[in-house]
Amino acid sequence: MAGEVVEPKLPIIELTDENLMAGTSSWKSTSGEIRRALEEYGCFAAVYKKVPTELREAMFGHGKELFQLPLETKLQNTCDVLGFGYGGKFLSMPLAEYLGIENGGAVDSTNKFANQMWPNGNTQKFCEETVSYSKLIAEVDDAVLRMILESYGLLEKYYEPLKDSYMYLMRFIKYRSPKMDETKIGHLPHKDRSFMGVIDTNQVGFLEMQTRDGKWITFDPSTYTNSTLIFVAGEPFTAWSNGRVYAPLHRVIMKGDEDKYSLALFSFMRGIVEVPEELIDEENPQQFKSFHHFQYLKYCATDGSKEKDPLKAYCGV
């Protein structure tokens, strides 16, 4: 009908053996879909069936066990980088709590984390399953990175340098159900400081993403299969792509009386984020100067916390 308003919807992309096979026509067309989704929305839902149901359920079980630990135990999970260790008891976000494993997917760091949480416990099952799960999510994240680079014609030149600088943060997240008089906002609106985030969640509450024109898209996990992952681009990805990729403002909204559990794998670059010269031309002049990813994280935790647009303030041209 003329004049009908079409509400924006989260793009859904199925990732299969066929379209993940590099060089095929299906791979190239899916690469274009992913690029368009990230440029327009900064996020997409990926249907990905290679994570065994039993492993996924075990991981959410581990998350529940972790958050039942005493606060003094969880506080042992520390890191110099804000957001990489334990977070909770936030005045502005009373429902949210998280625990992070730096170098998520690596055996040594996972063992260290498990021994902190359960110093007298049997941590073998937790470690084996967490490493296996993290590696599976890292594999699909790697496949998506390759496809984005392919879509920009940058795969051969930039894949290895980017991948060599990658490190992952594995995070367990809990949003408890709100009490009668409490806010229903699990996580305040924010943009990610990671390069990319891959989020897996149980079927509770909503994840909402804001579009470029200020509208909110709602992802209701209860209406999707358990094989659905959410990819969310972070601000450093926006900078690297010279503004092409959108980093969306997003938030978590709670409903009902169940707790929400999520698993997230965030990618960070150990070195410099730099716009490829191929993405700079007369029509697309350089928007961002080169910067060190972890120095940017420190800035966001200090002076940048006062800025409306910390990325522009820190490295905008």
Say what each PLM segment does:
Residues 1-317:
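Peripheral, non-catalytic segments flanking oxidoreductase cores
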